Amino acid sequence: MPETPASDLVRSLLLTVPDFPQPGILFRDLTPVLADGPALRAVVDDLVAACGPVDAVAGVEARGFLLAAAAAYASGVGTLAVRKAGKLPGEVLRETYALEYGEAAIELHPGQLAPGSRVLLLDDVLATGGTLEAAARLLERAGYEVAGIGVVLELADLGGRERLAGHDVRAILTL
């Protein structure tokens, strides 16, 4: 992906924290990007423009919520929350996905949009792709079309894009 003003801003603001949350992990901290108004605007504008018209924007808990709300506002559409299991009351759709040690689950309220609605799915980082793959399945099970998947940062060595084959994936910055 060619460099853009958004990718330049992300690269300049991204923090790298060694040994967090445990020894041997090189954590990429995007909070400075989200805290910078021009950077956030550039990121959201690029993610929205890459997808085309949508009916809603879904965000994966937790930082995906921030991106989804901003993108939905910029697009004049609503937002959907893909939550960690046990956080939504009432009827939910649930998808489990593998973690390095064990598994996790995410949930979505069904029936929030008309069947066939186009939804842009956003999260902060694409690593192994497990969470976004599960989130895309949730949206499809709810009867929606995943119009695109957008992230601020893709960690290419972890192979997440391959797990999302068949989806249009846009990363602002790939490392």
From Swiss-Prot:
Q: Does the keyword RNA-binding apply?
A: no
**Organism the protein comes from:** Clavibacter michiganensis subsp. michiganensis (strain NCPPB 382)
A single GO cellular-component term on record: cytoplasm
Name of the protein: Adenine phosphoribosyltransferase
Principal place where this protein is found? cytoplasm
Task: Tell me the CDD domains matching this sequence.
Answer: PRTases_typeI
> What is the role of the protein in this entry?
Catalyzes a salvage reaction resulting in the formation of AMP, that is energically less costly than de novo synthesis.
According to its UniProt record, the EC number is: 2.4.2.7
Q: Does the keyword Transferase apply?
A: yes
PROSITE patterns linked to this entry: PUR_PYR_PR_TRANSFER
Q: PANTHER family from the xrefs?
A: ADENINE PHOSPHORIBOSYLTRANSFERASE
* Keywords on record: Cytoplasm, Glycosyltransferase, Purine salvage, Transferase
The organism's place on the tree of life at top rank = Bacteria
